[in-house]
Amino acid sequence: MSEIRNYTLNFGPQHPSAHGVLRLVLELDGETIVRSDPHIGLLHRGTEKLAEYKPFNQSIGYMDRLDYVSMMANEHAYVMGIEKMLGIEVPERAQYIRVMFDEITRILNHLMWLGAHALDIGAMTVFLYAFREREDLMDCYEAVSGARMHATYYRPGGVYRDLPDTMAKYEESKWHSGKKLDQLNETREGSLLDFIEAFTERFPGYVDEYETLLTDNRIWKQRTVDIGIVSPERALQLGFTGPMLRGSGIAWDLRKKQPYEVYDKLDFDIPVGATGDCYDRYLVRVAEMRESNKIIKQCVKWLKENPGPVISDDHKVTPPSREDAKSNMEALIHHFKLFTEGYSVPEGESYTAVEHPKGEFGIYMVSDGANKPYRLKVRAPGFAHLASLDEMAKGHMIADVVAIIGTQDIVFGEVDR
């Protein structure tokens, strides 16, 4: 009688559902998964080591490139670490701007996740819908920083500049003309805050569209209900944070439990799941988009009523205005020193974490008193989630691995660093 053996299969890194560069070695018994072994490191760029060779203020751009769909949330943890070690006070207006852009980033991330997750499972429409909304939010990034993705907008002491009074408009082209052009520019007549406010009015309707397509869809439920179940106790043991932990029923959110910036002044809820399966995590992230929309609305209202400075006036840490640099010798010296050698941070260490769209994103920073970090450690939420893949996938079918990778919301920039 011939021997029955499990066979080994490579999943990725070329697979379209591998979300970048995931290589999984799957051990299969027929079509049932016995073991799944993630092989990481294909996107390793040595970010932590590179940061040790750059002045503190020159590594912000590296943070954007960690989780490259949640750019400003990464920057936030890094600049908060520097501010904590230097004891810098951030103006209240800058704090509201940061919180507003953190939530815009959360929606951007969840739209990308929803579109890609649905596409992996076979629902193509949601992918196209999600990218329609992402376009508007990318325009907000571009309005404040000039870049659609890698913004480098957060700076130690505040943000790069205040919110613009005008929004860029679409111009006539072979793609946009006449009535369509007027429709596209309708919400771009006022300031950036007017544009964001108009978006927050439209967005709940868009989320309803996604839910109409997926939430009660029989095929979607068959592919996600009771797949990749993680109990609350096990989720804590595995180091889950963010929607992965809340999907298992634990209401842990740093914005509520360890408030930073102005989150303690804002009204929002923490959505939690009940069973800890892929479907629950889907519901949690969709509910989070609605909550983020609520927070953005509150920030817009406050920012419209309260003008003020958006960055600290300590020119040892923040650059002087261009007008000052052109007319004042001392300001020019500050500017030159800041952009050539940066500033020295007192000896010590700090750990700062933010409620990133994927979970707890933390920066552990050690300074030896020089102008560069002695050591920088990034605590990436996706790393802990990916480590649980073997446990979550065991006993499921090979097609369910795609649903489980999707529900974990893995981005390899932060996992491989």
Curated annotation (Swiss-Prot):
Class of the enzyme per the UniProt entry, highest EC level: translocase
Reaction it catalyzes: a quinone + NADH + 5 H(+)(in) = a quinol + NAD(+) + 4 H(+)(out)
Keywords: Cell inner membrane, Cell membrane, Membrane, NAD, Quinone, Translocase, Transport, Ubiquinone
Subcellular location: Cell inner membrane
Enzyme Commission number, as recorded: 7.1.1.-
Subunit note: NDH-1 is composed of 14 different subunits. Subunits NuoB, C, D, E, F, and G constitute the peripheral sector of the complex.
Protein name as annotated: NADH-quinone oxidoreductase subunit D
Organism: Hydrogenovibrio crunogenus (strain DSM 25203 / XCL-2)
